Amino acid sequence: MIELRHEVQGDLVTVNVVETPEDLEGFRNFIRAHLNCLAVDTETTGLDIYSDTFECRLVQFGTQDEAWVVPVELGDVFIEDVRIAIGALKRMVLQNASFDLQVLDQCFGIEMEGLWPRVLDTQILAKLVDPRPFEAGGFGHSLEELIAKFISEDQAENVKKLMAKLAAEHKTTKAKIWSTIDLFHPEYLLYAGMDTIFTARVCKSLTPLVPDVSRSLVPYEHKISEICSYIDRQGFLLDVEYSRSLAEKWLADQEVWEAIAFTEYGVEKVNSTEDLAEGLEEMGVKITGRTETGKRQVNAALLDKLVEDGNELAAIAQEAKKLGKWRKTWVQKFIDTRDSEDRCHTFINPLQARTSRMSITGIPAQTLPSSDWIVRRCFIAEPGDVMASVDYQAQELRVLAALSGDRNMIEAFENGADLHQMTADAAQVPRKVGKTANFQKVYGGGAKALAEAVGISIPVAKRVHEAFSATYPGVERLSKKLAMEAGRNGYIVNAMGRRLPVDSSRTYSALNYMIQSSSRDVTCRALIRLHEAGYTPYLRLPIHDEIVASLPASEAERAAAHIGHLMQEQMGPVLVGTDPEVGKRSWGSLYGADY
């Protein structure tokens, strides 16, 4: 057995490392002595849990003063002890639990269903205390950031940076060091064991800081994370043949545009700002913008303006860049990261923004072009299934109506009136302007932003905003009330008890934060109802105000209608209704694809 010592907050702590089967007796005694609660963590070969090459190397358990590290990479005898230990623990504390639970499930068959009820996730606690990332004035939510805040900046710097140090020493990258470092390298073992000691200490500091008003959110957010981890695990079936064909087509098209840029305009590389700037200036374009290093600036805004003015080189460059980006970041990535069963796996972060809106990586559903079917066509339903989508009807505007109690807005929804036309008529502008103004109230933005978005003058934009306030006075009252609350307290609190910090210089954002946070909770409450009704195995993506599912073809219409019924919610006087839609085999069929 290896024994490592380290000092934390004036305490000498111990990391014990199992080397042989004989060492397991000491580990078992440690588990027996701490059955009520232990911090748990894993060390793996990387982050791609569902790839064929992914492995779990170490599993570690710890208190605030002692940790045990088990080298599961060495085989079944060690894995079995870990399996027994995890089964015996009444409570487990983890940082970013979804990742480690999926590791234990995928690598050792320890099903998450039996683990989640016993889990306390320090990352969830941290986000309930302060949802802001470090860059936005919060203390952050990574373990390194939490160590810096609640234990010591030196500890965060020294121990959590060990792997970066080892990568540099071994002349490799931080991404590769996890799989290549010797299993018993003392600094690797110290890093692993200390993670659980740090997590246990961070948990002790965080728990009393969760505001009383937010306490009920602790089990609620754990349930949301649990459901999302099951969606992650399930994966979304990829049509590999179509995806490869699309990637090849986009590459060929990109090369054609690049060839035209070279032969017609002498631009060798459209992705080279200098080459492109040279070509544009030879056409008579004056580039006034400069980068921080003094070079000519050719950014998206300039290209958009030039394309609008009919500049062919700008259009060619824009198209080539777009095809390259879409191919690499979307389609080729789907192909490269799919698992052995041709599934791509999401990694859903249910508490990402300061308003708690979800984010998704793996399948970047939230960043795909809103009406495009070509990329979505890559994903298909299970054999014998079809794709279905259920989205909310004007979710955020209905939430705004419910929160504000504005009679005009409520009656508009009750009577099926056109809210966008009402705003437009009040300001004597086209419906498009009224629609943009309505959504700006949801997302925030002043007259200048409205003017730029729809191409009107600032005086007209101000008139539209004034017309909105006059038409929906309840919204204006709510906005002022929330801004005052934010100015007084530095935060507002939504109906679920979630504290939302608001910067003192941006108290006008309080309404936007309240709407986004409340809308997110409408979707999350729906996820819980769907889970309780047994629909989770069929769910593929939660996308803000929409749920995408793979449903048996023979039951799809009925099931989609039932999902829609479960998702809808009565918020006071306003029904936040849903629109179920059933497509064909591919996700893209819901956007116009013929398959």
UniProtKB/Swiss-Prot annotation:
Source species, domain of life: Viruses
Region (Polymerase) residue spans: 213-595
Biological processes per GO annotation: DNA-templated DNA replication; double-strand break repair; viral DNA genome replication
Cited SUPFAM superfamilies: DNA/RNA polymerases, Ribonuclease H-like
Residue span, 3'-5' exonuclease domain: 1-212
This enzyme's EC code(s): 2.7.7.7, 3.1.11.-
Keyword terms: DNA replication, DNA-binding, DNA-directed DNA polymerase, Exonuclease, Hydrolase, Nuclease, Nucleotidyltransferase, Transferase, Viral DNA replication
Catalytic activity: DNA(n) + a 2'-deoxyribonucleoside 5'-triphosphate = DNA(n+1) + diphosphate
Cited InterPro entries: 3'-5'_exonuclease_dom (IPR002562), DNA-dir_DNA_pol_A_CS (IPR019760), DNA-dir_DNA_pol_A_palm_dom (IPR001098), DNA/RNA_pol_sf (IPR043502), DNA_polymerase_A (IPR002298), RNaseH-like_sf (IPR012337), RNaseH_sf (IPR036397)
Keyword rRNA-binding: no
GO molecular function term, any single one: 3'-5' exonuclease activity
Known role: Replicates viral genomic DNA. This polymerase possesses two enzymatic activities: DNA synthesis (polymerase) and an exonucleolytic activity that degrades single-stranded DNA in the 3'-5' direction.
Family the UniProt entry places it in: Belongs to the DNA polymerase type-A family.
Protein name: DNA polymerase
Lineage: Viruses, Duplodnaviria, Heunggongvirae, Uroviricota, Caudoviricetes
Gene that specifies this protein: 44
